[in-house]
């Protein structure tokens, strides 16, 4: 399920919008994730106390973590599917240390697409959304494959 060159161009053009404010986009993605799927918040001891969108918006730690998440994802997307080393490292930490189920990766993927569309509607139309969805699915499938190698049933 690879992406065409044209699809990768759409993905990376959209990601260029994220890179103008990685921390801000990351914070919004995490807020969307945590408010839409409150069970995901339980995996983050540092953020469990944040109960409302306003509290999350005011959290510098959440903003920093959003920056970390989207910086890592951006590095993976820029590999255009040739991200084995990056995914292996990420899967090891997410399986062994953080215990993040694959389903949560699907939730955050949906949050990313929602935030990009909300913030950049004219630059993130149906074609770009479809391409990003495919790129994130490729990432999730590769994470799931690594989880299996690691014996993590997430």
From Swiss-Prot:
GO terms for biological process: removal of superoxide radicals. It catalyses: Fe(III)-heme b-[protein] + nitric oxide + H2O = Fe(II)-heme b-[protein] + nitrite + 2 H(+); H2O2 + AH2 = A + 2 H2O. It is found in: Cytoplasm, Sarcoplasm. Its main location: cytoplasm. The keyword Heme applies. The keyword Protein transport does not apply. One of its GO terms (molecular function) is peroxidase activity. Disulfide bonds: none annotated. Nitrite binds at residue 65. The modification Phosphothreonine is found at residue 68. Keywords: Cytoplasm, Heme, Iron, Metal-binding, Muscle protein, Oxidoreductase, Oxygen transport, Phosphoprotein, Transport. Heme b binds at residue 94. Monomeric. Monomeric heme protein which primary function is to store oxygen and facilitate its diffusion within muscle tissues. Reversibly binds oxygen through a pentacoordinated heme iron and enables its timely and efficient release as needed during periods of heightened demand. Depending on the oxidative conditions of tissues and cells, and in addition to its ability to bind oxygen, it also has a nitrite reductase activity whereby it regulates the production of bioactive nitric oxide. This is Myoglobin. It comes from Capra hircus. The gene is MB.
